[in-house]
């Protein structure tokens, strides 16, 4: 088991409970899709896992260790084992592709090396190899500001893999992409989950994508899990009755 959430709850200052007693596990190589409308709690849950938001109740257990109270070096070590893929890419637009990929190892190298761009030959070789893996080697020295959304997200995937993560957290990774680019990005994520045995937690609005690429789906409604099962068991009745009704939106629920 890579990750376990036990009774995670979070209440925002407005008084709305964004998460209510969330519990689940995810295994190595498993792709778990989190679905639900905006405000359902998807992004809050991902932020609690990465300690960008502190839950009010419950435990997050990663590789058998409770991470709720980790601080300083231990918290950085924990985060270095988790790759992040963002809806808005979170790239440095003025830098080229390989420089952005190299940023993926900043959490595991001395801060002075990162600040000065002092990467080892091994790190550089790994960055180029990852760009090749996602079909972006020919754009290695191109500024990211000149690339398409799909190309930027592929660089985002390579950057996340730079730290050799045990877990990928993907916050709406295809929300800004066209259908073809979306399929390309999800194919790469699935490929790495299978070939590198990386657990992947992906929040999605696109139901068909969740059914096609996920091994398992969890649906949230108003901060509660209303479905947890395999894609084939998620029928229209469950969708309309349990998932896409009575969702309240709160300013606390944001993308990562």
UniProtKB/Swiss-Prot annotation:
Residue ranges of domain ABC transporter in the record: 3-247
Enzyme class (EC, first level): translocase
Locations listed in the record: Cell inner membrane
An example Gene Ontology molecular-function term: ATP binding
Reaction catalysis annotation: phosphonate(out) + ATP + H2O = phosphonate(in) + ADP + phosphate + H(+)
Its EC number(s): 7.3.2.2
GO cellular component: plasma membrane
Assigned keywords, A-Z: ATP-binding, Cell inner membrane, Cell membrane, Membrane, Nucleotide-binding, Phosphonate transport, Translocase, Transport
Membrane topology classification: Peripheral membrane protein
Residue numbers binding ATP: 36-43
Pfam families linked: ABC_tran (PF00005)
InterPro entries: AAA+_ATPase, ABC_transporter-like_ATP-bd, ABC_transporter-like_CS, ABC_transpr_PhnC, MetN_ABC_transporter-like, P-loop_NTPase
Function: Part of the ABC transporter complex PhnCDE involved in phosphonates import. Responsible for energy coupling to the transport system.
Assembly, per entry: The complex is composed of two ATP-binding proteins (PhnC), two transmembrane proteins (PhnE) and a solute-binding protein (PhnD).
Family: Belongs to the ABC transporter superfamily. Phosphonates importer (TC 3.A.1.9.1) family.
Name this polypeptide is given: Phosphonates import ATP-binding protein PhnC
Gene behind this protein: phnC
């Amino acid at each position: 088991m890579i990750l376990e959430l036990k009774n995670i709850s979070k209440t925002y200052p407005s008084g709305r409970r964004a998460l209510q007693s969330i519990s689940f596990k995810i295994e190595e190589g498993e792709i778990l899709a989190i679905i639900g409308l905006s405000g359902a709690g998807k992004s809050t849950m991902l932020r609690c896992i990465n300690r960008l938001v502190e839950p009010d109740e419950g435990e997050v257990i990663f590789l058998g260790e409770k991470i709720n109270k980790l601080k300083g070096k231990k918290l950085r070590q924990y985060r270095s084992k988790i790759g992040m893929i963002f809806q808005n890419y979170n790239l440095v637009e003025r830098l080229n592709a390989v420089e952005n990929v190299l940023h993926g190892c900043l959490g595991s190298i001395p801060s002075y090396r990162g600040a000065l761009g002092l990467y080892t030959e091994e790190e550089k070789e790994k960055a180029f190899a990852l760009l090749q893996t996602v079909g972006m080697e020919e754009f290695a020295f191109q500024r990211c500001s000149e690339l398409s959304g799909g190309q930027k997200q592929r660089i985002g995937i390579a950057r996340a893999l730079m730290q050799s993560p045990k877990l990928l957290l993907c916050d709406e990774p295809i929300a800004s992409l066209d259908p073809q680019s979306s399929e390309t990005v999800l194919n790469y994520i699935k490929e790495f989950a299978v070939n590198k045995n990386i657990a992947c937690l992906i929040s999605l609005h696109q139901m068909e994508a969740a059914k096609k690429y996920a091994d398992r789906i969890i649906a949230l409604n108003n901060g509660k899990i209303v479905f947890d099962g395999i894609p084939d068991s998620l029928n229209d009745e469950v969708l309309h009755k349990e998932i896409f009704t009575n969702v309240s939106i709160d300013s606390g629920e944001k993308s990562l």
